[in-house]
Amino acid sequence: VLPLAGFKKIQPRVYSGFYPVDSNDYQESKKALDKLSLNDNSFTYEPESSQSLGHGFRCGFLGLLHMEIIRERVQREYNLEFLMTVPSVTYRIEDKKGQTLDIRKPSDLPDDNSLKCYYEPIALISIVTPSQYLGSVIELCTSKRGAQQDLIYRSNMVEIRYEIPLSEIIYDFFDTLKSASKGYASYDYDIIDYRESKMLRLDIHVNKKKVDALSQILHKDCLLYTSDAADDTPC
């Protein structure tokens, strides 16, 4: 059987680790995820293990809403509970030998001494908003490391286009945009490129031991902010 001309498999944009709350549910969890992947070709999973959380799965989704839908379906249809790691996008690295590698989870990131460049996925996002909320929307996009590409007025509405790192969109962008526009703005985006960026891995230690499942890959500026916030938090 040959695929239809022009057919392209949907690639996940967001990844998260799913670890059964009860380790005895691993095989049942695998069967459940397998069934879900058969009727949703945009959902992917593969086995992975964590020193702190044990055996689980690295799952791929179209976005956070898709991830939440899968989690709710597994809970409702199969009565299974998961611990979920912080969602992440696929980063790309180049080592000093000139080899490139895609990184889907922070714990796979090699030692900094062996790396030459980090690359992160960039999205072209198109936002339509009433003109009175334009200032708030621009402020939001700028805070997300966005670069304005276009601004088009359409009667009392405005379409504004920005290039923004995908990692800045997948978390709270939708909720913040709705708040900034009183619920009137809408948006759509496509991944257009990978670009060099200053990324670092943030490791979390509990009782002086690194918890690999809690590691995150963050932009250098965000990491400095996170570090300052942690310093202000009492132990």
Q: Which role fits each region the language model picked out?
A:
Residues V1-S227:
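Structural and coupling elements of P-loop NTPases
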Residues Y225-C235:
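Single conserved hydrophobic/aromatic residue that forms the stacking wall/gate
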